[in-house]
């Protein structure tokens, strides 16, 4: 449902990998449905869900092909496993005559027994549930004796930089099960929102995955978008050392000379000022007054000089 809301809103990118429209209120969705569906405006979440169901159900019933992802791939049985809290996943994978599952190569686990461990970790870390409302296993097209399911079933394995990631220092990121726990506890993510990260993955996981996939020179700010409080490392259910990996990327930035000179100069000046307590105190008082002036009567800062990106998704 969240992805449908984003698609209606001119394909707006999600702000969270588990809860893609967490940045929107019920009033925002009510305005969007009223504008796009031409229906009376309503703000009750249950009514909005019913409205979306009435629009989407005929599309599921008439679709010739369903495209899904997969949370895990089980090598022992050749199955895909999908966990959801909505029924849309099963409608998409069982009603159309053709089902195509697209997922990354890192999702493969050896056996059903192995996947049960991950199945206990994922919902607890993502939404606090013991298990999601729906856990769906798909193992090929429907058999002759079965009454439902697709006539054809295809799995598309996506590499897109994952094999290269496996061969490098960031290989531990391939353990990520996409639960979103790291961003839920990240003070930087909470301050700037998911859109400020500029690509598919927000939060601490995005600070590492985005530079790894698109190139460090194309995502210079992300490894520095962390306070190194280690909350992400503590809550990660698969024990990825996220702060350590971000620190390695910062070191690589310095070694390759990727940090722009204004940032290097600013850090040098800050380091000098931090050694002068009286001067540092004066500077912070001036900065506070400047930010109050920037906020004006709204008490909101929409843009900060020399700080591009961080305020693109949220006001200060």
PLM segments and residue spans:
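The feature marks the mature, well-folded catalytic cores of soluble enzymes
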Residues: 1-168
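Generic alpha-helical structural element
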Residues: 18, 22, 45, 104-107, ...
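Amphipathic alpha-helical surface "interface" segments used
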Residues: 53, 136-143, 270-274, 307-311
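Ferredoxin-type iron-sulfur electron-transfer modules in oxidoreductases and energy-metabolism complexes
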Residues: 145-173, 184, 188-303
């Amino acid at each position: 449902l969240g992805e449908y809301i984003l698609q209606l809103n001119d394909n707006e990118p999600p702000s969270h990998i588990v809860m893609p429209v967490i940045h929107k209120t019920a009033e925002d969705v009510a305005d969007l449905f009223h504008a796009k569906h031409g229906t009376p405006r309503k703000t009750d979440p249950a009514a909005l869900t019913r409205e979306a169901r009435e629009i989407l159900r005929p599309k599921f019933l008439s679709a010739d092909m369903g495209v899904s992802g997969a949370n895990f791939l089980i090598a022992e049985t050749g199955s895909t496993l999908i966990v959801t809290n909505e029924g849309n996943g099963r409608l998409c994978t069982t009603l159309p005559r053709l089902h195509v599952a697209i997922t990354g190569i890192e999702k493969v686990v050896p056996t059903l027994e192995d996947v049960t461990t991950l199945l206990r970790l994922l919902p607890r870390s993502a939404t606090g549930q013991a298990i999601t409302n729906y856990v769906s296993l798909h193992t090929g097209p429907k058999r002759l004796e079965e009454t439902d399911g697709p006539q054809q079933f295809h799995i598309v394995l996506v590499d897109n930089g994952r094999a290269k990631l496996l061969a490098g220092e960031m290989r531990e990121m391939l353990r990520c099960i996409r639960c979103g726990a790291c961003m839920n506890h990240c003070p930087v993510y909470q301050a700037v929102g998911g859109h400020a990260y500029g690509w598919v993955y927000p939060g601490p996981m995005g600070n590492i995955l985005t530079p790894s996939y698109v190139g460090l020179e194309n995502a210079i700010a992300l490894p520095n978008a962390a306070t190194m409080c280690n909350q992400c490392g503590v809550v990660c259910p698969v024990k990825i050392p996220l702060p350590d990996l971000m620190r390695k990327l910062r070191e690589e930035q310095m070694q390759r000379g990727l940090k722009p000179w204004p940032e290097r100069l600013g850090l040098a000046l800050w380091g000098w000022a931090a050694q002068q307590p009286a001067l540092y105190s004066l500077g912070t008082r001036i900065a506070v007054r400047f930010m109050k002036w920037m906020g004006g009567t709204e008490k909101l800062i929409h843009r900060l000089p020399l700080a591009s990106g961080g305020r693109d998704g949220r006001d200060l």
